Amino acid sequence: MSELQTLKAYLTQLPGTLLKLLNIDPPHNTIPEAIPDILDLYQGIERISINLIDNFGLFEITYLKPQFMIANSEVMLLLSTKNPYTLGVLHQLIYGGFEVEPNGFHLLKAINNGGKSSCLIGRQKDIERYDGGTKSIAKDTDMSTWVESAKVINTHDLSWMHYLDFENLHKQQQRLRQRTPEDLIEKLINRTDKWILGNYKQLRQNSLMIIIGDHGRVKLDLEYSGKIAQWREASVPIAILMRK
């Protein structure tokens, strides 16, 4: 990761950045400004594919080193936010802040109103809360999300897949007293890394893939110790970017 360009930004800057990259002017003085360095690097891309992964951040990419992401990432954004958990991250990405539709802003609606198409794939409850009536597909498992992703990543200007198996699998394993959450996180991240590699191979040229990590639905009591525990505690959400 020594050659990876690392930048700091606010999570709430991503909506404006996504719009600008899709040649849509963000509403003035409604959401935070776009990230200038990202606009300079990726201006002219034709489509964006977002993979949102629960329980994934700076600690996990550094400690677990998922092979595809490490090998292909060009830029890593360290995302500053008051709420790094799943619903907080979704809210800030959709609304550009913590208000609901501030001054009427909704990211997916703005993309559609700008003449571009979008598709959100994720859990039914999240879709009902956040799609704003735009095109969405509800899926119950990460496997079904990944299978569906192959149909949308090249047919929409913005495709957005949410990988969130950890929550249900962790509950199952707590009941059965199987596998620690640390082991489960590692297994799911490495599995999703392989799936995202498959998407990357399928993406048409001049696409931008963005992998966003959040802290999951709830705070976990993990069993890391010593410096690793301190490292994990200081972890922040990230976005890693790569052009196809």
Report each predicted region and the residues it spans:
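Feature captures the catalytic ectodomains and active-site-proximal regions of enzymes
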Residues: M1-K244
